[in-house]
């Protein structure tokens, strides 16, 4: 929540910056930087949080249906027995952890990527389509992108983690989507900064 509050002014900043240097350039840069940075950021978050687990896989007994946790593969390659989830009463100690600000910083960095895309995107979508089809042309791809690709992120990400046993594997989905957006957007999308939407009604 703190990282989101700190990042709110950046929506305005990148929106205003796109008026000067172009919307496409900022949005594509946000996608590219995010795709390249996700895994390093989440590795850093794992280390800051004090967890060295790389893989954790559970197995179900085919006869009894009981679930057992396999040893966890640590960063140094050692195997360690899986631990039980801490009771809720212990979570208070995490809130007062002195490294919390580092986690906030790492989340804030990701918020910057979001604002680089979402700051200019409203103006970009309005300028990209003529007035006669703007409502449908703007809302349909926007909501497909958010509803389908974004909405399925937890499901697909968790499925990838479950299939591979690697806690970072779920990041492959947003990385692939961001990379494809950068490639397709860089090659096919036009810059709209100089589009004057009011000229259509003159």
Set out the residue ranges of the language-model regions:
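Transmembrane alpha-helices of Major Facilitator/SLC transporters
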Residues: 1-16, 30, 34-42
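Transmembrane alpha-helical segments of major facilitator superfamily
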Residues: 2-7, 110-111, 142, 177
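Low-complexity, proline/glycine-enriched hydrophobic segments characteristic of transmembrane helices
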Residues: 42-105
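A late C-terminal transmembrane helix in Major Facilitator Superfamily
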Residues: 126, 132-164
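Cytoplasmic membrane-interface "Motif A"-like loop-to-helix N-cap segments
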Residues: 20-31
């Amino acid at each position: 929540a703190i990282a989101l509050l700190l990042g709110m002014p950046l929506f305005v900043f990148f929106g205003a910056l796109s008026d000067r240097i172009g919307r496409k350039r900022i949005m594509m840069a946000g996608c590219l930087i995010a795709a390249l940075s996700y895994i390093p950021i989440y590795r850093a978050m794992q280390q800051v949080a004090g967890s060295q687990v790389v893989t954790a896989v559970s197995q179900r007994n085919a006869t009894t249906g009981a679930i057992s946790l396999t040893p966890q593969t640590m960063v140094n390659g050692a195997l360690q027995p899986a631990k039980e989830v801490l009771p809720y009463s212990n979570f208070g100690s995490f809130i007062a952890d002195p490294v919390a600000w580092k986690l906030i910083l790492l989340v804030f960095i990701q918020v910057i990527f979001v604002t680089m895309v979402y700051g200019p995107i409203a103006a970009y979508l309005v300028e990209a389509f003529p007035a006669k089809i703007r409502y449908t042309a703007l809302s349909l791809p926007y909501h497909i992108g958010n509803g389908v690709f974004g909405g399925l992120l937890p499901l697909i990400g968790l499925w990838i983690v479950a299939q591979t046993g690697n806690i970072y594997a779920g990041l492959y989905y947003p990385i692939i989507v961001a990379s494809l957006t950068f490639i397709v957007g860089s090659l096919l999308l036009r810059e709209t900064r100089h589009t004057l939407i009011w000229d259509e009604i003159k």
